[in-house]
Amino acid sequence: MRIDKYLKVSHLIKRRTVANDVADAGRILVNGKAVKASYAVKVGDVIEITFGNKPVKVRVLAAEGPDRKDVAREMYEVIE
């Protein structure tokens, strides 16, 4: 799954277009490297998002999943 879609489905960012813009601005790092919106997310990846005043760091637990709010939280674990 592309990182822009993953961020939307996991409810880390509300809209895919916003996730795309954040990635294009270089504010999404995966395993310490800036990535484009088309990056394919893999289980175990560490994603750092600098969005607004609060940076978020999460580890991917599931790279695929339904777009349902009740299971979105199970797709990642917050590191920082």
Task: Locate each region found by the language model.
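Ferredoxin-like alpha/beta domains used as RNA- or RNAP-binding modules
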Residues: 1-5, 34-36, 40-80
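A basic, amphipathic helix-loop patch mediating RNA/tRNA/ribosome contacts
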Residues: 1-43
